[in-house]
Design a protein with these regions (language model features):
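Short phosphate-binding loop-to-helix
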Residues: 69-90
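N-terminal beta-strand-loop-alpha-helix module at the start
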Residues: 1-62
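Active-site/ligand-binding-proximal alpha/beta "capping" segment
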Residues: 83-100, 175
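Anionic-ligand-binding alpha/beta catalytic cores of soluble enzymes and soluble regulatory domains
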Residues: 95-144
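Short glycine/serine/threonine-rich phosphate/pyrophosphate-binding segments
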Residues: 13-16, 78-82, 105-110
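General beta-strand structural signal in soluble alpha/beta enzymes
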Residues: 6, 28-31, 49, 70-71, ...
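Long, charged alpha-helical interface segments
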Residues: 138-214
Length: 214
């Protein structure tokens, strides 16, 4: 089961939003992310959060139009985006595409990789989809990177140590390497064909792909 999860970052293009949300079985919005969904003509199935960014009037309006609201207190230990991930997992979602996740408040920008890691840890295969490319996190496993030759691919460790890092199908391959925070070895690699594979035996990696393809 696949979900499209709207965050409250910067808006993506309407064609991208409609294409990604159109292939989802469930559309979830984290609080103010519902605004971006509505602006693209999409009513979320579920809105999660404290509704401070969305506002009470619009929250009631989106509920009137068929969305379910999962309300949380303003004082909480998780971001609305993290709560949206958990809500999706509870509903049987196994894959999620995040929209409107890049940009926005600086603190929220740096939180996105950690939301992806939270999704990874509950078994959600997740990808941030943007007009400039994609971003995902893997922990202790491998994943294909699909795109076009010469797409830029950068990898960054999200844990104190990422061990057994292997890159196949890229211009600068790695085999069983170890990466540490503060290490820029993984910056700006590139695909040599239409797909490559990133693997890590232990630890977590953030993978950022820059491509012109949606």
């Amino acid at each position: 089961m696949r979900a499209a999860i709207f965050l409250n970052g910067s808006p993506d293009s309407e064609p991208l939003i409609q294409a990604v949300a159109g292939r989802a079985d469930l559309v979830v919005a984290a609080d103010g992310g519902a605004r971006y969904a509505l602006a693209a003509g999409i009513v979320p199935d579920l809105v999660v959060g404290d509704m401070d960014s969305l506002g009470e009037d619009l929250a009631l309006e989106v509920e009137r139009r068929g969305a379910s609201l999962e309300r949380h207190p303003a004082r909480k230990d998780m971001m609305d985006g993290h709560l949206a991930v958990l809500a999706a997992g509870e509903r049987g979602v196994t894959a999620a595409d995040f929209l409107c996740a890049a940009g926005g408040k600086p603190g929220a920008v740096f939180a996105v990789p950690h939301i992806l890691l939270a999704a990874e840890r509950i078994g959600l295969r997740s990808t941030v989809v943007t007009d400039w490319g994609r971003m995902f996190v893997i922990e202790g496993r491998s994943r294909l990177v699909e795109g076009s030759a010469r797409d830029s691919v950068s990898i960054f460790p999200l844990s104190t140590q990422a061990t057994g890092v292997t890159l196949e199908g890229m211009g600068y391959p790695l085999e069983n390497a170890d990466l540490y925070p503060g290490d820029t070895l993984g910056f700006h690699n590139e695909l040599i064909g239409t797909e490559a594979r990133v693997s890590v035996e232990r630890g977590a990696l953030l993978v950022v792909q820059e491509t012109s393809a949606p």
